[in-house]
Design a protein with these regions (language model features):
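Divalent metal-coordination and catalytic microenvironments
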Residues: 18, 41, 77, 100, ...
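Mid-to-C-terminal alpha-helical segments outside catalytic/metal-binding sites
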Residues: 128, 132-135, 142-183
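Conserved residues at the C-terminal ends of beta-strands
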Residues: 21-24, 103, 174
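Well-ordered, non-membrane alpha-helical segments in soluble/globular domains
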Residues: 1-4, 118-121, 152-154
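Mid-domain alpha/beta scaffold segments of enzyme catalytic cores
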Residues: 1-36, 40, 44
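Short loop/turn motifs at secondary-structure junctions
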Residues: 14-17, 69, 167
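Catalytic pocket-lining loop regions of alpha/beta-barrel enzymes
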Residues: 27-136
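Short glycine-enriched loops at secondary-structure junctions
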Residues: 23, 54, 142-144
Length: 183
């Protein structure tokens, strides 16, 4: 079924990604469905959006035909459960096409004296180290999340303002647009 759908494409052209999917147990990244999905994405050059922790991310990438070297995985929230900056850095170093999505990311921001969201120093350093590897998203997976959309985008605007303009533009738009062939 998936192969037929991919071959058919969409009115706007071919599919550019698969997902989203959730693995609530990291061990499921070794399962046959996850392995087949990731192999398909790897072979077809499709991006995959996965809500997984750092252990599952490592397994999903390592189990692909390219051993994660050509795999385009969008890591929702840059880790369910809040992987440390060091762990994110290690996975980014190992997998050159791993992308971190930043919605609802625990530990990304710290409140300043006025209560505004500002990037925590270690995250700011990581975003500056890998300016082409992060993107923002909305995570509107249930209707109620739309009630918070304005607040979410305002938070993005606030902490993106802590970055050099070219880096903020990459994270806020360019990286996602490039990933999906929109620019």
């Amino acid at each position: 079924m998936v192969q037929a759908e991919l071959a058919r494409g969409t009115a706007a052209g071919p599919y550019r990604g698969l997902g989203e999917f959730h693995l609530y147990d990291s061990a499921n990244a070794n399962g046959p469905v996850a392995r087949k999905l990731m192999a398909l994405a790897d072979e077809k050059g499709l991006a995959v959006l996965a809500h997984v922790d750092d252990v599952a991310t490592d397994l999903l990438m390592a189990n692909t035909p390219s051993r994660g070297q050509q795999t385009r995985l969008i890591w929702a929230h840059t880790g369910i459960g809040g992987a440390t900056v060091g762990r994110v850095q290690a996975l980014f170093a190992r997998y050159p096409r791993l992308m971190g999505e930043l919605s609802y990311r625990p530990g990304l921001t710290c409140a300043d004296d006025q209560g505004a969201d500002r990037l925590c120093p270690q995250w700011r350093a990581l975003l500056l180290q890998y300016p082409t590897r992060f993107m923002i998203g909305s995570d509107t997976w249930v209707n109620q999340r739309w009630l918070y959309y304005d607040a979410l985008t305002q938070s993005y605007r606030s902490w993106l303002g802590d970055l050099p303009p070219d880096v903020a533009r990459k994270i806020g738009w360019d990286n996602g647009a490039t990933l999906f062939g929109l620019q």
